[in-house]
From Swiss-Prot:
The chain crosses the membrane at residues 121-139. Keywords: Membrane, Transmembrane, Transmembrane helix. One of its GO terms (cellular component) is membrane. It is found in: Membrane. It is a single-pass membrane protein. GO terms for biological process: riboflavin biosynthetic process. Pfam families: RibD_C. It comes from Bacillus subtilis (strain 168). This is Uncharacterized protein YyaP.
Length: 188
């Protein structure tokens, strides 16, 4: 009998500006285009777990759309909140009904997660957590949606990466909004 269970992958799926920023200088993400053709719902159906840094979790991990927001946005957030959430934090350590907090032993804890049965895992961010995962060799797939805007300043995607990373491009897609999505695999 063959074993059809494959190890779960850590996928960094992120919007980024042409000049490499994931947020503007004041944390703004108003430049991010939610293009329905990008298949974000399909991506969310491919995962069952989301990994957040504490700041990202505080901002987005518990986000509730406003009553006046479109139904499509409400459905999207409902799908996001249906996923199991892990928060990486040096300061918070409680487990609540919204998330499981991980304070140390990141490499070991994430490798345990990857070996558990389930769908792929979304590395949501923020930038510091992304850097930690890259430096530990934990990112399996980079799925970057490059938006047609140059901010000039803001929070860069890659900070303090300590090694050269050779990637293999596996897919590119372009959208009428001007967004270009590039998918790379890394066998770090």
């Amino acid at each position: 009998m063959t074993n059809n269970l494959k190890q779960r992958r850590i996928i960094l799926d992120l919007a980024v500006t042409l000049d490499g920023f994931i947020e503007g200088k004041n944390g703004e993400v108003d430049w991010c285009i939610m293009d329905p053709d990008m298949g974000f719902t399909d991506f969310l159906n491919q995962i069952d777990t989301i990994l957040y840094g504490r700041k990202s979790f505080d901002l987005w991990g518990q986000y509730i759309p406003k009553n006046e927001d479109p139904d499509t946005e409400k459905e999207l957030w409902k799908l996001v909140h249906s996923k199991k959430k892990y928060v990486f934090s040096r300061t918070q350590n409680e487990i609540d009904n919204q998330a499981i907090f991980i304070n140390d032993n990141i490499l070991e804890e994430v490798n345990k997660l990857k070996k558990n049965p389930g769908k792929d895992i979304w590395l949501y961010g923020g930038a510091s957590l992304i850097t930690t995962f890259i430096n530990l060799g934990l990112v399996d797939e980079f799925r970057l949606s490059i938006h047609p805007v140059v901010l000039g300043e803001g929070k860069p995607l890659f900070i303090d990466v300590k090694q050269r990373i050779n990637l293999k491009m596996v897919n590119t897609r372009t959208f009428s909004s001007g967004v270009v999505q590039i998918v790379y695999h890394w066998n770090g």
